[in-house]
Amino acid sequence: DKIDEIKRVSALSAPVKYQLKDNKVIIDFPKDFNGKKLTGEALLYCPSDENRDIRQTFSILDEPLKMKVPVTKSGLYQLQLSWQDGKTSYYFENKIFLK
């Protein structure tokens, strides 16, 4: 369940890192996932207006996840990541301000 998925993220060797650059949110997963294919969904959830949500499914291997963000979508969001490394599920969320 989600509580276990959050605990698994806390137990990783490093935190999930993200940054906003060139109208993209770039998400770096810890080295624990090197050589593992990650599949899942990323959501930029806008609490004030669900029509501003940005959702993206992904499948990556040893690369950062890049989410395009339209310039019209500035404001406070919650970054929600749900992913699997083939056998184990993980969940991460944090607030992010898009400019």
Language model regions located:
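Residues embedded in well-ordered secondary-structure elements
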Residues: 7, 16, 31-33, 68-70, ...
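Generic hydrophobic, helix-prone segments enriched in Leu/Val/Ile
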Residues: 1-3, 58, 86
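Structured, soluble extracytoplasmic/luminal domains of envelope-associated proteins
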Residues: 25-80
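Intrinsic-disorder/low-complexity, polar/charged segments enriched in Ser/Thr/Lys/Arg/Asp/Glu/Gln
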Residues: 13-15, 22-26, 64-66, 91
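Transition segment at domain starts
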Residues: 1-22
